[in-house]
Amino acid sequence: MAKKGPKRHLKRLAAPVRWELPRKIHKFTVRPLPGAHPMSESLPLLLIVRDILKYADNAREAKKIIKMGKVLVDGRVRKEEKLPVGLMDVVSLPDANENYRVLFDRKGRIKLKPTENPDVKLCKIKNKTVIKGGHIQLNLHDGRNIVIKVSDPTKAEEDVYKTGDTLLISIPEQEIKAHIPFEVGKLAYITGGKHVGDFAKIVEIERRGIYPDIVTLENMDGEKFKTVKDYVFVVGDEEPIIKL
């Protein structure tokens, strides 16, 4: 039997649990295109305009708003209504003078929170690769790649960025404004698990080789808990480097 290509439909009952939308009013919803964020951790732009921000009554109106270039994501006009918008992305509507940052609430649901810093964004380093010339390419959580030029690839002191660290970058220019290392004592935002949406201090990092690293944290109530490194997004020292 021949291949039928990628899936194009998504039933509401099968939509990711992070999506806060009525499940039984209609049968289908918008399926996001493959992109910078996984479907389980992002929302298509159409749902943000129609269901979250309530700027449209139906899909047709939402598409029209998007196609007219009225919506910006990370400082760039986006005209694809199925574009996946995920964690830390900035959604802007210049005509309404409104800016929102995508975060998770205490139940793990995707929420848009008004932001006072729409020109910067926090990005987690997911991976690093060495490219031609010995320069370092940082692969960030939102699909971005930033190349760090090094004068001498043999000098380890020039390689200051590690996986798990966080960068504060300008958008859309991608200029690095600040670097927050993943280390004990840093403030972290929890992106998954039982404590999703919480802020907590890193107390201990347990390196486990081929197994996921375990991080011990302490929240603002003094409660200690453990989670995997993938769920830990460092955001500052005593306070987040930008308001979240």
Swiss-Prot record:
Q: Which UniProt keywords apply?
A: Ribonucleoprotein, Ribosomal protein, RNA-binding, rRNA-binding
KW rRNA-binding (keyword) present:
yes
What Gene Ontology molecular-function terms does this entry list?
Answer: RNA binding; rRNA binding; structural constituent of ribosome
Task: Please report the stretch or stretches of sequence annotated as the S4 RNA-binding domain.
Answer: 43-108
**Does the UniProt entry include the keyword Ribonucleoprotein?**
yes
Which Gene Ontology BP annotations are present?
translation
UniProt-listed Pfam families: KOW, Ribosomal_S4e, RS4NT, S4
Q: Name one GO cellular component term.
A: cytosolic small ribosomal subunit
Instruction: Show the CDD domains listed in the entry.
Output: KOW_RPS4, S4
Q: Which family does it belong to?
A: Belongs to the eukaryotic ribosomal protein eS4 family.
**What's the name of the protein?**
Small ribosomal subunit protein eS4
Q: What is the name of the gene encoding this protein?
A: rps4e
